């Protein structure tokens, strides 16, 4: 009976140890992936200065002029603000600025034109409700654009590091508990 109990205990310890090591390895892999993808974007972000923006005007643009002809396009919002003592164009995020510099806000779903237009009008109404809000600007002197929201800010970095840290801590705790259990069982067997 005693030998079966010891064998079962060893199998359970081995499984728990494997679980702990697997959790630690997953955390290390996740840290590596985040370190090569998210961290460089955070470090390269120039939108670090938080400023107070005042709304100047908003326009809904749904046509683009190409070669003198107006071509239908998805609806988007154009927002002009006063920030850091000068006129600037407000962009929703870094990606909005990269996708289309003629739009401050691009709706998420562009499949249905009417739904996209309703989304843009809702965002426009929110801007008109709050005339003064916080935005992010760069320290570059000649930059005439600001961001409403940073994609790669400190909150995003901390949120993405939460689960790997939780996994690493849990794995290390499991490994520590197995090692403590082994040493206590050896001490108990010696007495």
Swiss-Prot record:
The chain crosses the membrane at residues 16-36, 158-178. GO terms for cellular component: voltage-gated potassium channel complex. Residues 1-15, 179-191 are cytoplasmic. GO terms for molecular function: calcium-activated potassium channel activity; potassium channel regulator activity. It comes from the Eukaryota. Residues 37-157 are extracellular. InterPro entries: K_chnl_Ca-activ_BK_bsu. GO terms for biological process: detection of calcium ion. It is a multi-pass membrane protein. It holds the Pfam family CaKB. Coiled coil: none annotated. It is found in: Membrane. The keyword Transmembrane helix applies. Keywords: Glycoprotein, Ion channel, Ion transport, Membrane, Transmembrane, Transmembrane helix, Transport. N-glycosylated. Glycans are attached at residues 80, 142. Belongs to the KCNMB (TC 8.A.14.1) family. KCNMB1 subfamily. Interacts with KCNMA1 tetramer. There are probably 4 molecules of KCMNB1 per KCNMA1 tetramer. Regulatory subunit of the calcium activated potassium KCNMA1 (maxiK) channel. Modulates the calcium sensitivity and gating kinetics of KCNMA1, thereby contributing to KCNMA1 channel diversity. Increases the apparent Ca(2+)/voltage sensitivity of the KCNMA1 channel. It also modifies KCNMA1 channel kinetics and alters its pharmacological properties. It slows down the activation and the deactivation kinetics of the channel. Acts as a negative regulator of smooth muscle contraction by enhancing the calcium sensitivity to KCNMA1. This is Calcium-activated potassium channel subunit beta-1. It comes from Oryctolagus cuniculus.
């Amino acid at each position: 009976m005693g030998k079966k109990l010891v064998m079962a205990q060893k199998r359970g310890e081995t499984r728990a140890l494997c679980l702990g090591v697997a959790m630690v390895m997953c955390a290390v892999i996740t840290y590596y992936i985040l370190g090569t993808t998210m961290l460089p974007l955070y470090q390269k972000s120039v939108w670090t200065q938080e400023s107070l923006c005042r709304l100047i005007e908003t326009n809904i643009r749904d046509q683009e002029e190409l070669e003198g002809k107006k071509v239908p396009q998805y609806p988007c919002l154009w927002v002009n603000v006063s920030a850091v003592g000068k006129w600037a164009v407000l962009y929703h995020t870094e990606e909005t600025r990269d996708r289309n510099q003629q739009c401050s806000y691009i709706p998420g779903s562009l499949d249905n034109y009417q739904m996209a237009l309703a989304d843009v009008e809702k965002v426009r109404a929110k801007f008109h409700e709050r005339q003064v809000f916080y935005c992010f600007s760069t320290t570059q002197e000649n930059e005439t654009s600001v961001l409403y929201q940073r994609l790669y800010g400190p909150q995003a970095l901390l949120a993405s590091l939460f689960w790997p840290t939780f996994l690493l801590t849990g794995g290390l705790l499991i490994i520590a508990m197995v090692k403590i259990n082994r040493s206590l069982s050896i001490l108990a067997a010696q007495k």
